[in-house]
Amino acid sequence: METPKALPNAELLFVIPEGIHMAVSYKKLWKLLIDKEIKKKDLSSMAGVSPATITKMGKNGHVTTEVLLKICTALGCRIEDIMEVVPEQQHL
């Protein structure tokens, strides 16, 4: 197994064994929208992101950090409240 190397400004470094693939899941975001009674189209307007981007997130697609920050600002939450990184088979 590879030895972790220190990275500037990094609190933690994960070494992912070969063959393990990680994916992004936005299940937390969809639950938060339900809890706050916010529709996806309303989130798009609130955050200033395109409906296509929200659709992409609905398919667990990758979006920029800027998009995530806009959504968090609009919802008054943190990034870890709307997304998580999971082993690939768990995000389906």
Where are these regions (language model features)?
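Short, charged recognition helix plus adjacent turn
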Residues: 2-23, 31-32, 56, 84-92
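Residues in the helix-turn-helix
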Residues: 42, 53, 67, 81
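Recognition helix of helix-turn-helix/homeodomain-like DNA-binding domains
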Residues: 49-63
